[in-house]
Amino acid sequence: MALPCSPLRLPVRFAIAGFVALAAACNDSTGPQARLSDPQGLSSDLQAVDGAFQSSTFQSFSALSFAPGSPVAAPSRMGALLAAAPIVPPRARTQPYASAPARLQALRLAASVLSSGISANVIPPTMYGQTWVWDEGTHQYILSPDPGPNNGIRIILYAIDPITGQIVEPPVAVGYVEFLDWSTPSTDSLQVILRGGTPSVPGTTYADYAVSATVTGDPPTAFSATAGGFVSDGTRTLTFGATFAVTQVDTDNPDTQIDVMWDIDNPVIHVELHETLAQSDADHLALTLTEFSITRGAETVSMHGTITSVLSTEAFSINLVVDVNDVPWIRIRGTQNGATVRHPNGSDLSPEEGQAFLDLFFLSATIEFAVLNLFTPAGSFMGA
């Protein structure tokens, strides 16, 4: 991965996604040097994780937000709740600053939407017991006479065109999703269950997770949310647990603490994220990445450091270190005008290390996109 040792002159939106892949081998620093024990094995394991999100049922679920007539297309309290606590594995923190403003906004929006007080339900009670199906005649979802869950709604899922993401006609059912409301007077809570088969003969459970939230004050001054559950393709399973908390919600500079853990069973990988987001004012954001780590066997690859950003101009500075078992492996430094990715002792990444490095970052971007699809349909329904 030998490239010219010059800053990358790219627009911020491209530099955000591209500097990791392009600036990988400039030599100008010294220090202790770690090595991956098996970079090719790490790449192989990371690539295998994609399978947890490849079931046809999961893909069909991801299309619900855009399907005409879908009951999850209208904003409501539920969207705010789900957007506030995404179960997204960060893009292996290639650009942790990129999603930070959106995450803060989602948390503030959720607190605002829910600020009227935690209600006894997230889904309107008038929708309880409903089942929604695709109608080929009108090319949209319609309410079915079939009964749904007593405390929520059911939506039948159909095969989609892999190119357009639209439901194929004539429709072919591939599973169903249920949104179950477990809210209490003190906590908004929603469970999402994604299954193959039919309601009368359920098949594989591809996802089962819950999101809950509480708000302090009216208008709100603090907000907290938790999320937990699993995603599977029937062979691989990714389980997760997360907590999100924001203070100073009633100002233009809220502070946020995020703690998330993921565990993948095949291959066995453990992921942790601990970070804080702080705003000195409405335009300046500082992210402190305490830990983003991936553990595989006896080896832990972890990232830590800081990113500061000016939201109005998209200017940013980044200073991160990637360790292998607590010994520095890679340093990432730069601004929106250019960044470098190199060993701390100045040596180039080997081709195998370079591939593992890219897989570490960009496979997690794939996971992020896939898991976002878990929240987008319900998020639209709930007001996100």
Give residue ranges: language-model regions.
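Bacterial N-terminal signal peptides that target proteins for export
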Residues: 2-15
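Processing junctions and N-termini across compartments
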Residues: 17-20
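C-terminal motif of bacterial Sec signal peptides marking the signal peptidase cleavage site
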Residues: 22-25
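N-terminal "mature head" segments of proteins
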Residues: 27-153, 324-384
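Long, acidic/polar, low-complexity amphipathic helices and coiled-coil-like
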Residues: 109-234
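Generic "edge-of-domain/loop-turn" microfeature
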Residues: 164, 184, 199, 267, ...
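Edge beta-strand at a domain terminus
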Residues: 205-214, 243-244, 375, 384
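Intrinsically disordered, low-complexity segments enriched in Gly and acidic/Ser/Thr residues
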Residues: 237-353
